[in-house]
C-alpha cells in the first residue's frame, strides 16, 4: 500500500511539473496575420491580400470576423494561433490590429506541433 501511494504521489508530481512547463505566461511580439491564408501563401501577411478566389480584397479582416484563426507571426518565423479572451467573439478585439506589430501576453503552449497563445492583453507597437 505504501509503495502504491508513493508511486501515485510521484506520478501526480511529475504531471503537475509537466503541465506548468508547457503552459507558461509569456509576452511575445510580432505581426497579427490571417493564419489560413498565411499557410497557403507566406506572402499573405497584410490586410490587403485578396480572397483565394481573387475577387474580394481585405481577406484578413473578413476571415477574422467570420471566426477564422488569427495568428502572431514572430520575427523568427514562428506562428502562434491566438486563442483566449482576445480571440473571443470572432476576433472582435483583434480585427483592427491585423497586420500591425503587437505584443501579446498570455499562456503559451504547444500541442501536436501547433503553438498557441491564450492572449489576455495586447499592446500595439506599430502599424
Model-predicted regions and their roles:
Residues 13-23:
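Sec/Tat signal peptide C-region and signal peptidase I cleavage site
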Residues 1-12:
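Bacterial N-terminal signal peptides that target proteins for export
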Residues 23-127:
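Mature soluble domains of exported/periplasmic/lumenal proteins and thiol-rich metal-chelating peptides
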Amino acid at each position: 500500500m505504501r509503495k502504491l501511494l508513493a508511486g501515485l504521489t510521484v506520478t501526480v508530481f511529475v504531471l503537475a511539473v509537466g503541465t506548468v512547463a508547457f503552459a507558461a505566461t509569456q509576452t511575445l511580439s510580432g505581426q497579427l496575420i490571417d493564419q489560413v491564408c498565411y499557410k497557403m501563401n507566406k506572402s499573405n501577411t497584410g490586410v490587403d491580400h485578396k480572397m483565394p478566389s481573387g475577387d474580394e480584397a481585405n481577406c484578413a479582416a473578413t476571415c477574422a470576423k467570420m471566426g477564422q484563426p488569427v495568428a502572431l507571426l514572430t520575427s523568427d518565423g514562428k506562428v502562434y494561433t491566438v486563442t483566449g479572451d482576445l480571440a473571443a467573439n470572432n476576433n472582435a478585439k483583434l480585427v483592427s490590429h491585423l497586420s500591425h506589430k503587437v505584443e501579446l501576453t498570455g499562456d503559451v503552449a504547444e500541442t501536436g506541433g501547433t503553438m498557441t497563445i491564450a492572449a489576455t492583453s495586447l499592446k500595439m507597437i506599430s502599424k
